[in-house]
Design a protein with these regions (language model features):
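Short nucleic-acid-contacting surface segments enriched for D/E, G, S/T with interspersed K/R
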Residues: 56-71
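Generic beta-strand structural signal
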Residues: 39, 50, 66-68, 80-84
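OB-fold nucleic-acid-binding modules
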Residues: 1-32, 58-61, 79-101
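OB-fold (S1/OB) nucleic-acid-binding surfaces
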Residues: 24-52
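Short, charged beta-turn/beta-strand-edge "cap" motif at the junction between a beta-strand
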Residues: 73-78
Length: 101
């Protein structure tokens, strides 16, 4: 699916693109009491870009200019902007990892 076609509340969404931004990771306290790292990246295709929340060990694998594919995610709105989220069943595939940071 093209990024420009994404809408709030979509489920089971697959997108692909290039990572154009990787934010600082931060610790988030979960309802279970555990703490998990999360960061926001931006993924861009030829139709647009979207923020994506990346959790845990996936953070270390993502670099700027990496070509990735995200599967089984969902779209929600946060601060009047849609964003892509990888849920429990979501998958991240790195198709091409750039050495550029």
């Amino acid at each position: 699916m093209r990024i420009s076609e994404l809408q709030n509340d979509q489920k089971n969404v697959n997108i692909g693109g290039v990572v154009t931004y990787v934010g600082q990771s931060r610790d988030v306290s979960l309802k279970s009491g555990s703490v998990e790292k999360v960061t926001t990246i931006t993924v861009q295709d030829d139709s647009g870009s979207i923020p994506v929340n990346i959790w845990g060990s996936m953070i270390e694998k993502i670099k700027i200019n990496s070509e990735i594919r995200l599967e089984k995610g969902y779209i929600n709105e946060f601060r009047n902007q849609i964003q892509f989220n990888l849920g429990y069943y979501g998958k991240l595939f790195i198709l091409l990892n750039s050495n550029t940071e």
